[in-house]
Every structure is written in C-alpha cells, then in structure tokens.
C-alpha cells in the first residue's frame, strides 16, 4: 500500500482487491459483510460447526469476554495473549494458560453468549467440554489413527460416508 499514500480511497480499493490472499484464523469479508472463520473447514464432520459456534458465542458475549480477559490476565493482556498463542501453536491444549481457568472461563462465556441468542446453538460447542477435560482434541485422534495405520487408517476413520 506504499504507493497509495495520501489516496485513502485507492488504498482501500487495493486492500479489498488483495484481502482474500490474507490467511487469518478469522477475518472480516468486507465485500459481503460477513466474518469468515477458516478453521471450520478443517474439522472432522461431527465438529464442523464447533469453531463457528465458539466464535459466534464469544462475539455475542464480547463485553463479558473483554472484562474476563482484563480481570484474569491483567495488564499487558495483549502481549500475554500473543505469547499464549505462540505456545499454543507449539503445544496445543497443553500450553500453559495465561491465567488459571482461562479456557474454562472463555468456553463458559461463549456458551452464555449462544444461550442468550435462544437458538440452541450452544450444543455445537459441547464437544469442547471433552477437549478441556481430557486435554485432547481431534488432531490428537487423527495423529493416533495415522500412527496406527498410515494414510489408509486416517482416511478410513475420518472419511465422510
């Protein structure tokens, strides 16, 4: 966008033209007015709605989520959350949480946000209860399937019939 200094309209148009190349976990789609949650398409079939429901629940409870983060993580929360993200990329669910009960608190707030909507969508985040309790998710299950029998076992276990 360097070539567009001083021309905010041209810079905005260039951004809109190229923004679909940016790979984020979640991003606004300006042209169509939606929020795209990319990890949703990478889940086993029975969990396909879980990331979207979790994201929606957190958005619906945004004020409570913000207060929870500030209250539990404290000052410098952005830096602490970025460090947590880095650790979670490497260690997954086993990464030390930035505060005791952090994930439990976020899941409870997401559930509350979905419940307030009144559509019964909170059922879509139920599988995350097991992830929190057993500290293991679908990626670990897929890894075990692959270790047992390679690609054939993995496809056999996760193929949509």
Where are these regions (language model features)?
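C-terminal accessory/tail domains of diverse enzymes
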Residues: 1-161
């Amino acid at each position: 966008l360097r070539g567009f200094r001083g021309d905010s309209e041209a810079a905005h148009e260039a951004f809109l033209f190229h923004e679909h190349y940016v790979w984020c976990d979640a991003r606004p789609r300006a042209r169509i007015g939606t929020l795209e949650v990319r990890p949703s398409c990478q889940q086993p079939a029975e969990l396909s709605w879980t990331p979207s429901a979790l994201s929606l629940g957190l958005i619906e409870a945004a004020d409570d989520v913000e207060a929870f983060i500030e209250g539990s993580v404290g000052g410098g929360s952005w830096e602490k959350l970025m460090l947590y993200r880095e650790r979670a990329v490497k260690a997954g669910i086993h990464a030390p949480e930035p505060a005791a009960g952090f994930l439990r608190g976020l899941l409870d707030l997401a559930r509350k946000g979905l419940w307030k909507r009144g559509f019964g969508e909170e059922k879509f985040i139920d599988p995350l209860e097991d992830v929190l309790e057993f500290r293991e998710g679908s990626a670990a299950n897929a890894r075990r399937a692959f270790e047992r029998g390679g690609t054939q076992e993995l496809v056999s276990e996760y193929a949509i019939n």
